């Protein structure tokens, strides 16, 4: 079973037990988070595709930590003018462990 979720403007393919790095979430370390924007759900041969989201399905996870990515260095340079500038940036991200993919039973 897997699902494709949307968070932070990006899409992630997740299964139960996966650990993913997503854009920084405003949830404390160790707390539960519920993803409700499910774009695609595949279970035992059946596939549900959302228009735009799958109804009655949630993905639950636990925030493991908040970390910073490797530094991205941006260089500005003008030839023959002795002009050089170097700036660095480290983006925050959250590590999330996917605990459960829940599907609401419909009768």
Swiss-Prot record:
Gene Ontology cellular-component annotations: cytoplasm; ribonucleoprotein complex; ribosome
One Pfam family from the record: Ribosomal_L21p
Xref: InterPro entries: bL21-like, bL21-like_sf, Ribosomal_bL21, Ribosomal_bL21_CS
Gene Ontology MF annotations: rRNA binding; structural constituent of ribosome
Family statement drawn from the similarity comment of this UniProt entry: Belongs to the bacterial ribosomal protein bL21 family.
Function text: This protein binds to 23S rRNA in the presence of protein L20.
Name assigned to this protein: Large ribosomal subunit protein bL21
Organism: Pseudothermotoga lettingae (strain ATCC BAA-301 / DSM 14385 / NBRC 107922 / TMO)
